Amino acid sequence: MKIHREGYPTILITFIIIVLINFLCFYSTKLIFIQLPILLFTLIFFYLILHFFRNPIRDVEINNKHIIAPSDGKLVVLEEVFENEFLKENCFQLSIFMSPLNVHKQWYPVNGEVIYSKNHDGKYLVAWHPKSSTENERSTIVIQTKEKQRVLFRQIAGAVARRICNYSSRGDKVNQNMEAGFIKFGSRIDVFIPKKSKIKVSLNDIIIGGETILAELYI
């Protein structure tokens, strides 16, 4: 299992704490029915941390017409909205909720140039709260395709996720097989796409980052 680089510090700290806990346990008592459950619990916990920071390699099919899912999760919002931060127009919003068991790496949804990238401080409301998109800690990235269509996606911190890693800078040339960022410990991704796009998913669908086609751009 390949581990994402964002997990290295957390994994190292967790490993040290687990070693100390088990050392103290085995040093302070000889009772096997105390030692073994603690050892088992800490090993399971360490495995879950490793599993959270897994970094799967996916065969992303690059297609200029496709808007691919930037993350794993479940599609919890699919509606027409007015995007107020940058696009300033009506568009479709697709929101993907990530549980702690999902892969938390993000991919770019389209090919093009990053024309906007901004990090916002904020609250830590639960990721499914309607106001989390505008009030939580978040990063907003806008990509303009060669056909001048713009797709905005937003990394949103949740009640557990307290760190967003945004790898985008204005002027970057990006494509769909490139890594866009990482969010630690559960959160949400909002994607805002042109109204003329043809939606290819339905509400409550299970989404696979880098593979699921959310929509097709009108070209």
Task: Put a short name on every predicted segment.
Residues 1-219:
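Contiguous, well-folded functional domains in the mature portion of proteins
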